[in-house]
């Protein structure tokens, strides 16, 4: 099988390039080892916003009396919230697949191996190409905390699919993803602590805005440990922090 363009990685860069090439009439093969859409659609922006919307509705229901609406004993089902999130993601993934298929892009699910600049192997098949485009994205960064390899910690992927409400949760890192999960689990009644090595959360944002957001999160009950590094991961429920 020979194609004018082979693309490895079906995230936003890969599938957009594949669609554009297909529209231009080129023969295209796209390799993706997980799901089309990449991290943002499957494990990032879209699923977290879907979870947060469910949490927002639950918050409204709990405080509905403020708006002269009676909602007795508002409750939630985390399993169904996660199922709804997965349904939304699947629908969007299918939408991407339909667009690519409409432009004759050949989609191959599996981990591709580059043999040389014009040859790729995947799933026991060999594919030849005139041009090769790499859009492989990124991997989850696990901070080099001593002992972390012996701890059954969560990554964002685990948090997205978790169906049991923990009593408490410590989040190492106060960036965008960390704060999204902090907000979500706090809304469900979980005691959340955010450990951040910088002097403010959301380091890439304006500091005044970050401080305002932190104050709002604190009102919801989130505890913050700023300018704090995790010294050691002892167990699933025990982190060692510096004493100051």
Where are each of the predicted segments found?
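N-terminal Rossmann-like FAD-binding beta1-loop-alpha1 element of flavoenzymes
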Residues: 5-29, 181-186
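Short glycine-rich, flexible loops that bind phosphorylated cofactors or substrates
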Residues: 15, 141-142, 178
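Glycine-rich flavin
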Residues: 1-3, 19-26, 31-165, 198-202, ...
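Rossmann-like NAD(P)H-binding beta-loop-alpha module
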Residues: 164-197, 204-205
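Conserved small/polar residues in nucleotide/adenosyl-binding loops
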Residues: 237-243
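Beta1/beta-strand and adjacent pyrophosphate-binding region of the FAD-binding site
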Residues: 1-10, 167-172
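Glycine-rich Rossmann-fold phosphate-binding loop(s) that bind the pyrophosphate
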Residues: 10-11, 33, 174-175
């Amino acid at each position: 099988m020979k194609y004018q363009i082979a693309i490895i990685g079906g995230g936003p860069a890969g599938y957009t390039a594949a669609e554009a090439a297909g529209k231009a009439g080129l023969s295209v093969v796209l390799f993706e080892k997980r799901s089309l859409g990449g991290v943002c659609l499957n494990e990032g922006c879209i699923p977290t916003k879907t979870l947060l919307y469910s949490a927002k509705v639950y918050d409204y229901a709990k405080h509905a009396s403020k708006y002269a609406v009676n909602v007795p004993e508002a409750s939630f089902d985390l399993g169904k919230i996660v199922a709804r999130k997965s349904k939304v993601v699947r629908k969007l993934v299918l939408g991407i697949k339909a667009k690519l298929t409409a432009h004759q892009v050949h989609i191959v699910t599996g981990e591709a191996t580059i043999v040389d600049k014009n040859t790729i192997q995947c799933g026991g098949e060999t594919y030849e190409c005139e041009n090769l485009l790499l859009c492989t994205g990124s991997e989850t960064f696990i901070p080099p905390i001593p002992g972390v390899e012996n701890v059954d910690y969560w990554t964002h992927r685990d948090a997205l699919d978790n169906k049991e409400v923990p009593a408490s949760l410590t989040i190492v890192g106060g960036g965008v993803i960390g704060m999204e999960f902090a907000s979500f689990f706090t809304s469900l009644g979980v005691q959340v602590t955010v450990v951040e090595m910088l002097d403010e959360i959301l380091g890439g944002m304006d500091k005044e805005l970050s401080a305002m957001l932190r104050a709002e999160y604190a009102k919801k009950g989130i505890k913050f440990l700023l300018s704090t590094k995790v010294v050691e991961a002892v167990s699933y429920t025990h982190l060692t922090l510096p004493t100051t």
